[in-house]
């Protein structure tokens, strides 16, 4: 089993490549996250077009549709009430409506993810490996910052908290809580049997590294 298909330039490979960048974009920041989401949505719409919406819809999907529809209607209604307020002094703006409409992109993102999972386009092993690599990187960078009072990028440490590659943003612990779970499941799911001693040993070591980093990060 290879990480990608034999042909490098394929639709599935490009889609998976953007998914592999997810843990990295969270380290870089919001601009990278939003850009990656935009490219992911745009590319999948171009590649798969209407097929994205030809999935088996379940009860949970309907609940999610209702939720997003409620958010949209609520945003439009609030904006209408604001515009109809004759006693309003400050200038009108469409920020609330804009945010409501932009929020709908997450519904589209959900449908796309449902599609690529249902059609087995996503390469879970590659995604788990990517999450594991960046989780270990963040953990080791926190250790480095803890020992030398600055990380490998030169970000200084704090007396009580260490952010690693996140600089002034104290979110390293939250990052590890989200992405290190893939590290713990990598060997049991994709490389070694869950009862294998080597698998248990490697998983335990990675767990201790992540846990220690979370504690150090504050």
Give, region by region, the residue ranges found by the protein language model.
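Short aromatic-rich membrane-water interface segments that cap or initiate transmembrane helices
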Residues: 89-101, 159-173
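Short, flexible active-site loop motifs that bind/organize anionic cofactors or intermediates
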Residues: 117, 162, 177
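Short conserved micro-motifs on helix faces and helix-strand junctions that flank
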Residues: 26, 71, 165, 216-217
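Transmembrane signal-anchor hairpin modules in multi-pass inner-membrane enzymes, especially those
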Residues: 1-89, 94, 115-125, 129, ...
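Membrane-embedded alpha-helical segments of multi-pass membrane proteins
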Residues: 30-50, 97-111, 172-184
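Alpha-helical transmembrane segments of multi-pass inner-membrane proteins
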Residues: 20-22, 108-110, 125-157, 167-218
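Membrane-interface helix termini and inter-helical loops of multi-pass transporters
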Residues: 82-91, 150-161
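Alpha-helical hydrophobic/aromatic positions enriched in membrane-embedded helices and signal peptides
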Residues: 66, 72, 97, 130-133, ...
């Amino acid at each position: 089993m290879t990480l990608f298909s034999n042909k490098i330039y394929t639709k599935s490979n490009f889609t998976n490549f953007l998914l592999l960048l997810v843990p990295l974009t969270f380290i870089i920041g919001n601009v990278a996250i939003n850009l990656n989401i935009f490219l992911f949505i745009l590319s999948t719409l171009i590649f798969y077009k209407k097929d994205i919406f030809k999935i088996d819809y379940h009860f949970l999907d309907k609940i999610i549709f209702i939720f997003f529809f409620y958010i949209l209607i609520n945003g439009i209604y609030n904006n209408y009430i604001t515009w109809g307020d004759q006693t309003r002094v400050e200038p009108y703006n469409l920020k609330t409506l804009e945010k409501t409409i932009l929020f709908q992109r997450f519904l589209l993102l959900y449908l796309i993810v449902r599609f690529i999972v249902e059609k087995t386009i996503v390469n879970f092993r590659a995604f788990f490996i990517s999450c594991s690599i960046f989780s270990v990187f963040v953990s080791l960078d926190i250790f480095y910052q803890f020992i030398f009072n600055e990380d490998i990028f030169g970000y200084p440490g704090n007396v009580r908290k260490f952010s690693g590659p996140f600089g002034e943003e104290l979110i390293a612990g939250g990052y590890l809580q989200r992405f290190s779970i893939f590290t713990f499941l990598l060997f049991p799911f994709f490389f070694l049997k869950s009862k294998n001693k080597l698998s248990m040993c490697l998983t335990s070591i990675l767990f201790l590294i992540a846990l220690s980093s979370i504690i150090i990060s504050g």
